[in-house]
Amino acid sequence: MIRLILLSDFTESFSYNLLKGVLMYANSHEPWVVCRMPLSYKQTYGIKGVLKWAKTWHADAIIGRFDNDDNVEIFRENGIIAIAQDYKARFSNIPNITGDYYKTGRMAAEFFLRKGYQNFAFYGYRDTVWSQERCEGFYKCIAEHGFGNCFQSYQEQSLDDLWFYEAPPLLKWLQSLPLPTALFACDDNQGNRITELCKVNNIRVPDKIAILGVDNDEIICNLSDPPLSSISHNIVRGGFEAAELIVRLLNEEKVNYQDVVLQPINIINRLSTDFYSTTDTHIQTILKYINKHRSEEHTSELQSLRHLVCRLLLEK
């Protein structure tokens, strides 16, 4: 029986989806026991306190959202496998559960380009690898299509201030954007923040600013008004692969490990991006009809009209 500590933020769906993957592996192989350790435990007792608990509990492995100044080597020194869940930067001395963030950024850019947008924006953190690489992938893709000079970004906030932000400068930036703008947020939390600011300041979403997040956290996406579109990742698969890696590391002393890399799967299109940017009066007429009948959006007529709009935009 393998004993795993999952040190993570259980207020978000990412951790539960990761755990689902671990349990899928366990159900098809051997029993696992999982301790769900909240981040507050490490904040209170430090990394040595986490190790002390792990030793008392006889843990075999820990998947943790570690800070980069944490001495994660102490787990290996005590015979415990440690895997880092991406937080600010990747670790070089232990495996990471990370992602193809450039690819995610490109997927967001291609999505907006297909909708005909010519103005683009990114909202994210200044000090996290996953935010920075998503921004780079997004920008490089729109630059390749000739819109490199039509891009603005706001990356003033630290991840340490997750739940605190200064609204006035962010609002000033939003109000300065050319309209309509396609805005890619580094994750769903930040996307939700933008929809909230737009709502209370009468900036119409998606007509003026279309907003796309990442992670497809359904609670957060549906807290947004309008509901937030988001890029979905294979997080459950990542949990399964992390469990496989733990077993290999436990059974083979000198196994060469690779990071577990989550891949973007698709875009869950909700109302925050339900808009096409065009000056063509015929396409605008079709779009107005579609928006008027949103409650019937699953009818074959509206689906056919959506496909027609996509084809007409691609032909331009």
Residue locations for each model-derived region?
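Bacterial carbohydrate/catabolite-sensing allosteric modules
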Residues: 1-61, 70-296
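Short, well-ordered coil/turn residues at beta-beta hairpins
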Residues: 65, 185-186, 301-302
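Single conserved hydrophobic/aromatic residue that forms the stacking wall/gate
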Residues: 297-316
